[in-house]
């Protein structure tokens, strides 16, 4: 394989630029040419494809977002869009593609593979909800950003004796809420993976104020449960009498310079994706499991609720993607007593 392309798709995540940089520089070191695709699958179909060299990725490792831009392009789910994209790739002499993004991006990569065009996926999303990897690019940065914000909210919460509901991104996964909640010493964490009793949440707030000597209360809420405003309304209906405020951290979690960890894992996975394409391997997604690189079938990782990893013998192992999350939920309960 002499010429490959790289794209970012779906929601942006800190560390994507580090992954692009690794793909470009690793490929060049292997004697391959690299092309960038602007705006994900939309740019692929439109032919927004151009050469990338070491100079173009210089000084990008510390930048958040993605300099290749990103876009959601539902038309690629249709056969017409897929064939149009492949036609553009062949027109530019491209033989394989590295796709950086979330599960929607992986579905696109899976379609390319089904049409016989080699594609390798790299998990890039702050949500950390991609099967086949313990961590996704951008997750660590998002958690650190959330912790910094919650620490500041605690300052004002304690100054005024208030309860704060802090809503964080994560789509249908509670990873950001759990990690940020534990790291910031949240009093309660509400995530989609665990059922909750709103009356118990309200009574816990009251008990903390009346019997534990606390003058403030922090609840970290994953957006996959409900909005912060809706949760606050339910709290009031359940009898909460505290001075309640809601803060939605929103898209701020997607921005900022990536952490050292995100830069390292992005570089590691980007380099390995090139190695796979050089070997002519497509239809795989790169991930990290137990601090080691792993490869998973894109077909498995793109299916919600499945978690696949490969042994050295090539056997597929199915694991439980929510075990660590539930362990963390139990951990926070024990620490917030």
From Swiss-Prot:
Pathway: Carbohydrate degradation; glycolysis; D-glyceraldehyde 3-phosphate and glycerone phosphate from D-glucose: step 3/4. It comes from Streptococcus pyogenes serotype M3 (strain ATCC BAA-595 / MGAS315). ATP binds at residues 11, 72-73, 102-105. InterPro entries: ATP_PFK, ATP_PFK_prok-type, PFKA_ATP_prok, Phosphofructokinase_CS, Phosphofructokinase_dom, PKF_sf. NCBIfam families: PFKA_ATP, PRK03202.1. Pfam families: PFK. Its EC number is 2.7.1.11. Mg(2+) binds at residue 103. GO terms for cellular component: 6-phosphofructokinase complex. Catalyzes the phosphorylation of D-fructose 6-phosphate to fructose 1,6-bisphosphate by ATP, the first committing step of glycolysis. Substrate binds at residues 125-127, 162, 169-171, 223, 245, 251-254. This is ATP-dependent 6-phosphofructokinase.
């Amino acid at each position: 394989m002499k010429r490959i392309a790289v794209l970012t798709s779906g929601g942006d995540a800190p560390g994507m630029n580090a992954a692009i940089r690794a793909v470009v520089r690793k490929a060049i070191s292997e004697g391959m040419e690299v092309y960038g695709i602007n705006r994900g699958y939309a740019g692929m179909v439109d032919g927004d494809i151009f050469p990338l060299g070491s100079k173009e990725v210089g000084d990008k490792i510390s930048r958040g977002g993605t300099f290749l831009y990103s876009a959601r392009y539902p038309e690629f789910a249709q056969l017409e869009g897929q064939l149009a994209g492949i036609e553009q790739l062949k027109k530019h002499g491209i033989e394989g593609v590295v796709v950086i993004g979330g599960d929607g991006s992986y579905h696109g990569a899976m379609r390319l593979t089904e049409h016989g065009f080699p594609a390798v996926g790299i998990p890039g999303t702050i949500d950390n909800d991609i099967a086949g990897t313990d961590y996704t690019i951008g997750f660590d940065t998002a958690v650190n950003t959330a912790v910094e914000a919650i620490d500041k909210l605690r300052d004002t919460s304690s100054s005024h004796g208030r309860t704060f509901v802090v809503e964080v991104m994560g789509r249908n996964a509670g990873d950001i809420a759990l990690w940020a909640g534990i790291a910031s010493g949240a009093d309660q964490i509400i995530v989609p993976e665990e059922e909750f009793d709103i009356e118990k949440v309200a009574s816990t707030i009251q008990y903390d104020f009346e019997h534990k000597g606390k003058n403030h209360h922090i609840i970290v809420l994953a957006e996959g449960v409900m909005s912060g405003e809706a949760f606050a309304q339910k709290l009031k209906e359940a009898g909460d009498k505290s001075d309640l405020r809601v803060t939605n951290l929103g898209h701020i979690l997607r921005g900022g310079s990536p952490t050292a960890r995100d830069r390292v894992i992005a570089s590691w996975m980007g380099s390995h994706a090139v190695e796979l394409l050089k070997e002519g391997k497509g239809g795989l997604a790169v991930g990290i499991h137990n601090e080691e690189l792993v490869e998973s079938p894109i077909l498995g990782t793109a299916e919600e609720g499945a978690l696949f990893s490969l042994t050295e013998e090539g056997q597929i192992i199915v694991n439980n993607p929510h075990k660590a999350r539930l362990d963390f939920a139990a951990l926070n309960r024990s620490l917030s007593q």
